[in-house]
């Protein structure tokens, strides 16, 4: 799966191909329930249910299926100076066997102290990769996700977000 923001680093041709693949894969499932039923690994299913419960509690929203099996909660609008415009989920995750990706649309950089207490994980610009939830401290993960959710909601309350929040200023 290509996460939001990664398309900007790819060439135009690659973006079109990947975008088309995302649409085809996302069309395989009519609902979150159908997607969850397609997961075959018991650990992934259990971890996904826990994350759905956590993110519903934080956002007050049901999960929505975004491209290729990403489960997102709530949404915000963005509009960049480049003219690119769209909607994204505020918090979400992508379950795969052996690696769950938790998305923080404001990035991981501002959470360094909490991430140090999280447990076994790896990070990139706006992703936390976790092999299984039993490897991390769930209250710490919930605190990180809650702070990310509140920040994105505060940034988008007066209109579209006008920059990629997880990228550092140049």
PLM ranges: what are they?
Residues 6-7, 13-170:
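Charge-dense, helix-prone N-terminal extensions
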């Amino acid at each position: 799966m290509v996460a939001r923001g990664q398309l900007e680093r790819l060439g135009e041709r690659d973006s079109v191909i990947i975008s088309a693949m995302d649409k085809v894969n996302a069309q395989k499932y009519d609902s979150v329930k159908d997607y969850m039923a397609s997961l075959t690994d018991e650990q992934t299913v259990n971890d996904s249910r826990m994350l759905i419960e956590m993110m519903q509690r934080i956002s007050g929203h049901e999960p929505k299926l975004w491209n290729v099996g990403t489960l997102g909660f709530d949404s915000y609008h963005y509009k960049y100076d480049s003219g690119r415009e769209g909607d994204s989920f505020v918090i979400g995750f992508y379950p795969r066997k052996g690696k769950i990706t938790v998305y923080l649309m404001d990035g991981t950089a501002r959470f360094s102290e909490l991430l140090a207490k999280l447990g076994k994980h790896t990070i990139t610009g706006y992703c936390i990769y976790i092999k299984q939830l039993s490897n991390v401290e769930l209250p710490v993960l919930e605190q990180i996700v809650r702070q990310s959710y509140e920040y994105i909601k505060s940034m988008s309350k007066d209109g579209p977000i006008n920059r990629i929040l997880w990228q550092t200023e140049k």
